[in-house]
């Protein structure tokens, strides 16, 4: 019978995910984000305008609503742009890495042996620009699932095939 050992690992010798060159989201995805963003803010703007014109008590504060609306619009646009620039991904031999976050950076490293299945999604606007989103479902539940948006459709299909191949090798 083999004797049990539990040696200390020198963490300085472990590979560093921080040194991996990550791929940013496709530049066309910023256009998709802007269009989706615009749709939401146009709907909100129409609702506020209708409220302003149909209720007399709001006519006095309409200017404040408009100023607040545009400040929120510009701030949201800035936050979305920063968030877009921070998102990046990489696929390595044994895992996938995805980085996001504005104030604090969130980096997910998911080993392929934790992947249960993979889905490819195309939204209406994304499809117009030839982009897709790869969704990776893991054994850890929904909190550890990963969505990588803004990938060219052909590349997303290749990524899905790669991951499906990795899953098949595990079975």
Briefly describe each language-model feature range.
Residues 1-113, 117-171:
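N-terminal basic, Ser/Thr-rich segments that initiate or prime the first beta/alpha elements at protein or domain
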């Amino acid at each position: 019978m083999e004797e049990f050992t539990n040696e200390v690992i020198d963490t300085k010798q472990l590979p560093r995910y921080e040194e991996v060159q990550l791929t940013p989201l496709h530049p066309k995805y910023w256009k998709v984000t802007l269009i989706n963003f615009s749709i939401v803010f146009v709907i909100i703007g129409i609702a506020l305008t209708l409220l302003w014109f149909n209720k007399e008590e709001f006519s006095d504060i309409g200017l404040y609503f408009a100023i607040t609306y545009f400040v929120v619009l510009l701030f949201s646009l800035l936050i979305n742009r920063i968030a877009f620039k921070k998102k990046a991904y990489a696929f390595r031999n044994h895992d996938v890495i995805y980085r996001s976050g504005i104030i604090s950076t969130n980096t997910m490293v998911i080993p392929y042996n934790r992947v249960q299945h993979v889905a490819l999604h195309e939204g209406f606007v994304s499809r117009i620009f030839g982009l897709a989103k790869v969704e990776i479902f893991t054994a850890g539940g929904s909190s550890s699932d990963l969505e990588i948006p803004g990938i060219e459709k052909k590349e997303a299909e290749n990524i899905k095939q790669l991951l499906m191949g990795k899953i098949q090798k595990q079975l």
